[in-house]
Amino acid sequence: MSDWIWALIIGFVLDLLLGDPSWLYHPVCIIGKYIGWMEKKLRRRGGNLRKSAVFLTASTVLLTMAVVALILMLCGLLGRLPLLIAMALLDWMGIAITSMAKEARGVEKALGQGVAAGRTQVARIVGRDTQDLSEEEIIKATVETVSENTTDGVISPLLYAAIGGPILLWGFKAASTLDSMVGYLDEKYRDIGWSSARLDDVLNYIPARLTALLMVIASYLIGLDGKNAFRIVRRDHANHKSPNCAWSESAAAGALHIQLGGTHNYFGKPVEKPTIGDADRPAERADIRRANRLLYASSLLMMVLIVLIAIVR
């Protein structure tokens, strides 16, 4: 196997063991600062924001990839081992399994203290308004976020790291960060964020569908309803404005026999969304743990798939 696959294995294990340590200043924060600074600069300059959007997207992704390439080149000058360590660390910081699971567990724990505490905690990981959410709505929001993050935070990074090492992984992370900061359809971001949103859709197109397949298989392996997960994916995979989000959400909804999606408030305004899955039963706190199990199992399946392909090659 190539060194970058070994580095990916090491990075994957580090994420499982350590997550994102609180003392580590995450590279995504640096990317976010650049995006915020450049967005303000482009807005002040005026002109056609749709053209500026392309520059914002391209400069963020290419600059990120260039910095990672420079780091790897410098480490490579020191020898194979320093390069392997650098790649492993960059892969580790680009994967978000344990940190997402930890946030989800935090919501479940907060709900034990009451709905108000649950609302405060879930606000850390969702974009919708949370001040009026019921306990069941908090649980559903958490399950949705975990299932979406299985694509954005795990399967996509692993796929791009396997194809192009840390350079391609961090190109994807830059695009994902752009989408989370400016890739909205509201009046403020419609022009400056359109290219970031489209790039994120393109980059997640294959990983989203792969994630759904992995989640269906994982459902069988961990005792959830894989057959129903597959049925709901086939039926509801298009029930979202995004071409990608409903794939993993429908797999989770089917595996858990709960209904996700529906209308929610964002910035005080209701946003109508189709439902995903069937309301076979009310969502319960244990569904957060089940969603985390799906996250871990799907991630492990993806890593095994990458290693097997690397061995065969």
Question: What are the roles of these predicted feature ranges?
Answer:
Residues 180:
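Glycine-rich phosphate/dinucleotide-binding loop and adjoining beta-alpha-beta core of small-molecule
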Residues 1-175, 183-313:
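Hydrophobic alpha-helical transmembrane segments
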